[in-house]
């Protein structure tokens, strides 16, 4: 019986993190234990579709776009309570969310940093002060068309998204240093 040997290649950014960035962070922060070095835990991509309260078909486009961008089926988020002013009932779909971990996370981050962010018009860099106090970073994109996987002709409407990068860093400075070494284009304040 022959077995097919499948060679799995490590994502480019993950390899760079293990070979270069861990050493740079250990040197910069004088960590004694290699497990103290901050790393990535997960990336959460959230797309809110408030208009879906009036037209339920809009959520399908958001789910399709998010699945195309991330390569993973999104979870449809539903309203937890009714709000009369927004014509919203409990249980209505109002958004889609994907949590990326492992190799998919590293590949998505690589595509985001090397392809998607440079395609944003008038991009001046990300705000480096938006960390949450625990080393996690959240930022928003105004349109899904910056990702090359999305076919420009099949976009039914522009949708923005929130991207949260969760790290094991304990302070904002450690988180910012990790993200800067990974290649996040922060503005110089």
Swiss-Prot record:
Disulfide bonds: none annotated. The keyword tRNA-binding applies. GO terms for biological process: translation. One of its GO terms (cellular component) is ribosome. It comes from the Bacteria. NCBIfam families: PRK00010.1. Part of the 50S ribosomal subunit; part of the 5S rRNA/L5/L18/L25 subcomplex. Contacts the 5S rRNA and the P site tRNA. Forms a bridge to the 30S subunit in the 70S ribosome. This is Large ribosomal subunit protein uL5. The lineage of its organism: Bacteria, Bacillati, Actinomycetota, Actinomycetes, Micromonosporales.
């Amino acid at each position: 019986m022959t077995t097919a040997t499948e060679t799995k290649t490590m994502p480019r950014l993950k390899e760079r993190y293990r070979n270069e960035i861990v050493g740079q962070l250990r040197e910069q922060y004088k960590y004694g234990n290699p497990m103290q070095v901050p790393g990535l835990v997960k990336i959460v991509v959230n797309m809110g579709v408030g208009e879906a309260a009036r037209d339920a078909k809009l959520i399908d486009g958001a789910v399709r776009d998010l699945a195309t961008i991330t390569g993973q089926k999104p979870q449809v988020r539903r309203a937890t309570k009714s709000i009369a002013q927004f014509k919203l009932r409990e249980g209505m779909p109002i958004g889609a969310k994907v949590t990326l971990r492992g190799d998919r996370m590293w590949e998505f981050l690589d595509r985001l940093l090397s392809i998607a962010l440079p395609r944003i018009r008038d991009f001046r860099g990300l705000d480096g002060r938006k960390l949450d106090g625990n080393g996690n970073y959240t930022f928003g994109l105004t349109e899904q068309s910056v990702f090359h996987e999305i076919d420009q002709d099949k976009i039914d409407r522009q949708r923005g998204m929130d991207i949260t990068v969760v790290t094991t860093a304990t302070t904002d400075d450690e988180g910012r240093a990790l993200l800067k070494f990974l290649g996040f284009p922060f503005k110089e304040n």
